[in-house]
Amino acid sequence: DKMKSKKSKLAQTIYGKEVIKRVVNSVKKAGIEEVGVVVGENKEEIESILKDEVKYIYQEQCLGTGHAIMQAIPYLEEKSGRVLILNGNIPLITEQTIQKIVDKSIKEDEVATILTGIISEPKGYGRVIRKENKIYEVIEETDLEEVQKGILEVNAGVYCFKINELLEILGKLQKSSMGLYYITDVIKMMNTKGLKTGGVLVE
Protein backbone atom coordinates (compact mmCIF):
# COMPACT_ATOMS: atom_id res chain seq x y z
CA ASP A 1 0.00 0.00 0.00
CA LYS A 2 2.92 2.30 0.69
CA MET A 3 4.02 1.97 -2.93
CA LYS A 4 0.60 3.08 -4.06
CA SER A 5 0.78 6.38 -2.21
CA LYS A 6 4.09 7.22 -3.87
CA LYS A 7 2.46 7.27 -7.30
CA SER A 8 1.50 10.64 -8.72
CA LYS A 9 -2.19 11.34 -9.36
CA LEU A 10 -1.68 10.60 -13.04
CA ALA A 11 -0.31 7.12 -12.35
CA GLN A 12 -3.10 6.05 -9.98
CA THR A 13 -5.30 3.35 -11.47
CA ILE A 14 -9.05 3.52 -11.92
CA TYR A 15 -10.74 0.28 -12.98
CA GLY A 16 -7.35 -1.19 -13.74
CA LYS A 17 -6.05 1.61 -15.94
CA GLU A 18 -3.86 4.59 -15.06
CA VAL A 19 -5.51 8.01 -15.05
CA ILE A 20 -3.17 9.47 -17.71
CA LYS A 21 -3.69 6.39 -19.91
CA ARG A 22 -7.46 6.84 -19.75
CA VAL A 23 -7.16 10.50 -20.77
CA VAL A 24 -4.82 9.73 -23.70
CA ASN A 25 -7.09 6.87 -24.85
CA SER A 26 -10.14 9.18 -24.90
CA VAL A 27 -8.22 11.80 -26.88
CA LYS A 28 -7.13 9.22 -29.46
CA LYS A 29 -10.62 7.71 -29.71
CA ALA A 30 -11.91 11.22 -30.45
CA GLY A 31 -9.80 11.15 -33.62
CA ILE A 32 -6.84 13.22 -32.46
CA GLU A 33 -3.82 11.51 -33.98
CA GLU A 34 -0.89 13.42 -32.54
CA VAL A 35 -0.76 13.65 -28.76
CA GLY A 36 1.86 15.49 -26.69
CA VAL A 37 2.21 15.19 -22.91
CA VAL A 38 3.98 17.80 -20.80
CA VAL A 39 5.99 16.05 -18.08
CA GLY A 40 8.08 17.33 -15.18
CA GLU A 41 9.46 15.46 -12.19
CA ASN A 42 7.07 12.61 -13.00
CA LYS A 43 8.58 12.02 -16.46
CA GLU A 44 9.95 8.52 -15.84
CA GLU A 45 6.71 7.37 -14.27
CA ILE A 46 4.60 8.74 -17.16
CA GLU A 47 6.99 7.45 -19.83
CA SER A 48 6.81 3.97 -18.31
CA ILE A 49 3.00 4.08 -18.65
CA LEU A 50 2.59 5.71 -22.08
CA LYS A 51 5.83 4.48 -23.69
CA ASP A 52 6.00 5.72 -27.29
CA GLU A 53 2.26 6.41 -27.70
CA VAL A 54 2.81 10.17 -27.30
CA LYS A 55 5.35 12.92 -27.82
CA TYR A 56 6.94 14.15 -24.57
CA ILE A 57 7.43 17.83 -23.81
CA TYR A 58 9.62 18.58 -20.80
CA GLN A 59 8.89 21.20 -18.14
CA GLU A 60 11.93 21.77 -15.91
CA GLN A 61 10.11 23.87 -13.31
CA CYS A 62 6.47 23.51 -12.38
CA LEU A 63 5.25 27.10 -12.77
CA GLY A 64 1.61 26.52 -13.61
CA THR A 65 -0.59 25.35 -16.47
CA GLY A 66 0.26 28.33 -18.68
CA HIS A 67 3.96 27.65 -18.21
CA ALA A 68 3.40 24.00 -19.15
CA ILE A 69 1.85 25.09 -22.45
CA MET A 70 4.71 27.56 -23.05
CA GLN A 71 7.04 24.54 -23.16
CA ALA A 72 5.02 23.30 -26.13
CA ILE A 73 5.50 26.53 -28.14
CA PRO A 74 8.25 25.10 -30.45
CA TYR A 75 6.00 22.10 -31.11
CA LEU A 76 2.94 24.27 -31.78
CA GLU A 77 4.82 26.66 -34.07
CA GLU A 78 5.15 23.83 -36.59
CA LYS A 79 1.38 23.25 -36.59
CA SER A 80 -1.70 25.05 -37.85
CA GLY A 81 -5.39 24.78 -37.09
CA ARG A 82 -6.40 23.94 -33.54
CA VAL A 83 -4.92 22.38 -30.43
CA LEU A 84 -6.82 20.55 -27.72
CA ILE A 85 -5.38 21.02 -24.21
CA LEU A 86 -6.46 18.87 -21.27
CA ASN A 87 -5.40 18.46 -17.69
CA GLY A 88 -3.94 14.97 -17.29
CA ASN A 89 -5.93 14.16 -14.17
CA ILE A 90 -9.49 13.95 -15.57
CA PRO A 91 -10.00 10.20 -16.08
CA LEU A 92 -13.75 10.43 -16.69
CA ILE A 93 -13.41 12.55 -19.83
CA THR A 94 -15.03 10.74 -22.78
CA GLU A 95 -14.27 10.89 -26.48
CA GLN A 96 -17.85 12.17 -27.04
CA THR A 97 -17.20 15.21 -24.82
CA ILE A 98 -13.89 15.86 -26.57
CA GLN A 99 -15.58 15.66 -29.98
CA LYS A 100 -18.29 18.03 -28.78
CA ILE A 101 -15.80 20.73 -27.75
CA VAL A 102 -13.75 20.41 -30.96
CA ASP A 103 -16.88 20.41 -33.16
CA LYS A 104 -18.27 23.53 -31.46
CA SER A 105 -14.92 25.32 -31.78
CA ILE A 106 -14.87 24.66 -35.53
CA LYS A 107 -18.58 25.20 -36.22
CA GLU A 108 -18.80 28.48 -34.25
CA ASP A 109 -15.30 29.54 -35.37
CA GLU A 110 -14.25 30.16 -31.78
CA VAL A 111 -10.66 31.06 -30.94
CA ALA A 112 -11.07 29.37 -27.55
CA THR A 113 -13.70 26.87 -26.44
CA ILE A 114 -13.62 25.57 -22.89
CA LEU A 115 -15.39 22.78 -21.06
CA THR A 116 -17.34 23.82 -17.97
CA GLY A 117 -19.52 22.07 -15.42
CA ILE A 118 -22.00 23.02 -12.71
CA ILE A 119 -21.27 21.47 -9.33
CA SER A 120 -22.86 22.03 -5.93
CA GLU A 121 -19.51 22.02 -4.09
CA PRO A 122 -17.20 24.12 -6.31
CA LYS A 123 -14.43 24.55 -3.71
CA GLY A 124 -11.02 23.81 -5.22
CA TYR A 125 -12.02 24.61 -8.81
CA GLY A 126 -11.47 27.67 -10.96
CA ARG A 127 -14.79 29.52 -11.48
CA VAL A 128 -16.27 30.60 -14.78
CA ILE A 129 -17.18 34.30 -14.90
CA ARG A 130 -19.82 35.25 -17.46
CA LYS A 131 -20.74 38.64 -18.88
CA GLU A 132 -24.09 38.85 -20.68
CA ASN A 133 -24.20 35.05 -20.39
CA LYS A 134 -20.95 34.68 -22.37
CA ILE A 135 -17.84 33.18 -20.80
CA TYR A 136 -15.59 36.12 -20.02
CA GLU A 137 -12.87 34.71 -17.80
CA VAL A 138 -11.87 31.84 -15.55
CA ILE A 139 -10.52 32.74 -12.12
CA GLU A 140 -8.45 30.26 -10.15
CA GLU A 141 -9.69 29.43 -6.64
CA THR A 142 -6.73 31.23 -4.99
CA ASP A 143 -7.58 34.51 -6.78
CA LEU A 144 -11.35 34.54 -6.18
CA GLU A 145 -13.02 37.45 -4.45
CA GLU A 146 -15.39 36.44 -1.64
CA VAL A 147 -18.49 37.19 -3.73
CA GLN A 148 -17.24 34.91 -6.55
CA LYS A 149 -16.85 31.86 -4.31
CA GLY A 150 -20.58 31.16 -4.60
CA ILE A 151 -20.36 30.66 -8.39
CA LEU A 152 -21.19 27.02 -9.21
CA GLU A 153 -19.95 26.94 -12.82
CA VAL A 154 -16.41 25.58 -12.83
CA ASN A 155 -13.60 25.06 -15.28
CA ALA A 156 -13.34 21.37 -16.23
CA GLY A 157 -9.77 21.62 -17.54
CA VAL A 158 -10.37 20.99 -21.27
CA TYR A 159 -9.69 23.68 -23.88
CA CYS A 160 -9.68 23.91 -27.66
CA PHE A 161 -7.68 26.83 -29.08
CA LYS A 162 -6.83 28.18 -32.50
CA ILE A 163 -3.05 27.74 -32.54
CA ASN A 164 -2.01 31.08 -34.06
CA GLU A 165 -4.06 33.16 -31.63
CA LEU A 166 -2.95 31.03 -28.68
CA LEU A 167 0.72 31.51 -29.56
CA GLU A 168 0.26 35.27 -29.80
CA ILE A 169 -1.39 35.46 -26.36
CA LEU A 170 1.06 33.06 -24.68
CA GLY A 171 3.83 35.54 -25.45
CA LYS A 172 2.02 38.12 -23.29
CA LEU A 173 0.99 35.88 -20.39
CA GLN A 174 1.86 37.37 -16.99
CA LYS A 175 2.60 35.63 -13.69
CA SER A 176 -0.24 35.48 -11.17
CA SER A 177 0.00 36.73 -7.59
CA MET A 178 1.16 33.19 -6.70
CA GLY A 179 4.06 33.44 -9.15
CA LEU A 180 2.46 30.99 -11.59
CA TYR A 181 1.35 31.23 -15.22
CA TYR A 182 -2.24 30.07 -15.74
CA ILE A 183 -3.63 28.84 -19.06
CA THR A 184 -7.00 30.16 -17.83
CA ASP A 185 -5.73 33.77 -18.05
CA VAL A 186 -5.62 33.32 -21.82
CA ILE A 187 -9.45 33.33 -21.94
CA LYS A 188 -9.82 36.85 -20.51
CA MET A 189 -6.93 38.13 -22.66
CA MET A 190 -8.67 36.81 -25.78
CA ASN A 191 -11.99 38.35 -24.76
CA THR A 192 -10.31 41.69 -24.05
CA LYS A 193 -8.99 41.63 -27.63
CA GLY A 194 -12.51 40.99 -28.91
CA LEU A 195 -11.76 37.45 -30.06
CA LYS A 196 -14.60 34.93 -30.06
CA THR A 197 -14.61 32.46 -27.18
CA GLY A 198 -17.21 30.00 -25.97
CA GLY A 199 -17.89 26.97 -23.87
CA VAL A 200 -19.46 23.55 -23.70
CA LEU A 201 -21.32 22.74 -20.51
CA VAL A 202 -20.72 19.11 -19.59
CA GLU A 203 -23.85 17.30 -18.45
Model-predicted segments: where are they?
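A residue-level structural signature of the nucleotidyltransferase/glycosyltransferase Rossmann-like core
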Residues: I90, R127, V158-Y159
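Conserved donor-nucleotide/metal-binding helix-loop-beta segment in metal-dependent transferases, i.e.
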Residues: Q96-K123
